[in-house]
């Protein structure tokens, strides 16, 4: 599933081609996504894009009278293409732009979403979200407070959007490895120093992934059709049985809450 770096990479890729440009119309080839494509999107006609933002794993396209909310789901990607390029099997939504380009949404598993809202504050998918991990609000004081009485393992807690948004399976595993913290540790067992280190490495790992265009394991593509190259830098994720890059101990691969988890039993305590 695309996580924060992949969504931010998509945002940065499409923004220069959309802001200040008019959406001539939308083409919805298959509206049966995770939720049905909102009727307002079918009716788009001659509306300018004012901004392209991101909240958590949602892309937000600001229009004069509302917002398009896009979620990439499990396998979605957005590309900027010539409007003359024919659509393929899994190309479900196009925004046809006045600059001769289209924003094309591709999603083999159709678990993404194209939604509409008049105001962001009113939409349920954006309610009750925690802070952005790259913001000043996400700091050691905040994490220590939220972990203090939490009797659950730290990895699923990091992946809870009520704690912090956008830290999915890949980046939770990678950040815990970089911080030297075992994914099974109770959140309440983390010391102040460990909270400081974990916040620091989460920010560093996410920023590094954004620099590399995100992580492509299967479906994700950047807006120019290139894969994300952070996959080449993964320390533990997807490396079950391979030697730890630090100590050489075989990387462990297990399941936590039905999600794959990877760690080094020697480096993470």
From Swiss-Prot:
Molecular-function GO term, any one: 8-oxo-7,8-dihydroguanine DNA N-glycosylase activity
CDD domains according to UniProt: EcFpg-like_N (cd08966)
First and last residues of each zinc finger (FPG-type): 235-269
Organism field: Klebsiella pneumoniae (strain 342)
Subunit structure: Monomer.
Alphabetized PROSITE patterns for the sequence: FPG_CAT, ZF_FPG_1, ZF_FPG_2
NCBIfam families for this protein: fpg, PRK01103.1
Entry EC no(s): 3.2.2.23, 4.2.99.18
Gene: mutM
CC cofactor: Zn(2+)
HAMAP family membership: Fapy_DNA_glycosyl (MF_00103)
Name of the featured protein: Formamidopyrimidine-DNA glycosylase
Catalytic activity: Hydrolysis of DNA containing ring-opened 7-methylguanine residues, releasing 2,6-diamino-4-hydroxy-5-(N-methyl)formamidopyrimidine; 2'-deoxyribonucleotide-(2'-deoxyribose 5'-phosphate)-2'-deoxyribonucleotide-DNA = a 3'-end 2'-deoxyribonucleotide-(2,3-dehydro-2,3-deoxyribose 5'-phosphate)-DNA + a 5'-end 5'-phospho-2'-deoxyribonucleoside-DNA + H(+)
UniProt: DNA binding residues: 90, 109, 150
Keywords (A to Z) from UniProt: DNA damage, DNA repair, DNA-binding, Glycosidase, Hydrolase, Lyase, Metal-binding, Multifunctional enzyme, Zinc, Zinc-finger
Family annotation (InterPro entries): DNA_glyclase/AP_lyase_DNA-bd (IPR015886), DNA_glyclase_Znf_dom_DNA_BS (IPR015887), Formamido-pyr_DNA_Glyclase (IPR020629), FPG_cat (IPR012319), MutM-like_N-ter (IPR035937), Ribosomal_uS13-like_H2TH (IPR010979), Znf_DNA_glyclase/AP_lyase (IPR000214), Znf_FPG/IleRS (IPR010663)
Stored SUPFAM superfamilies: Glucocorticoid receptor-like (DNA-binding domain) (SSF57716), N-terminal domain of MutM-like DNA repair proteins (SSF81624), S13-like H2TH domain (SSF46946)
Cofactor note: Binds 1 zinc ion per subunit.
Family, as annotated: Belongs to the FPG family.
Any coiled-coil regions, as ranges: none
Residues of the active site: 2-3, 57, 259
Function: Involved in base excision repair of DNA damaged by oxidation or by mutagenic agents. Acts as a DNA glycosylase that recognizes and removes damaged bases. Has a preference for oxidized purines, such as 7,8-dihydro-8-oxoguanine (8-oxoG). Has AP (apurinic/apyrimidinic) lyase activity and introduces nicks in the DNA strand. Cleaves the DNA backbone by beta-delta elimination to generate a single-strand break at the site of the removed base with both 3'- and 5'-phosphates.
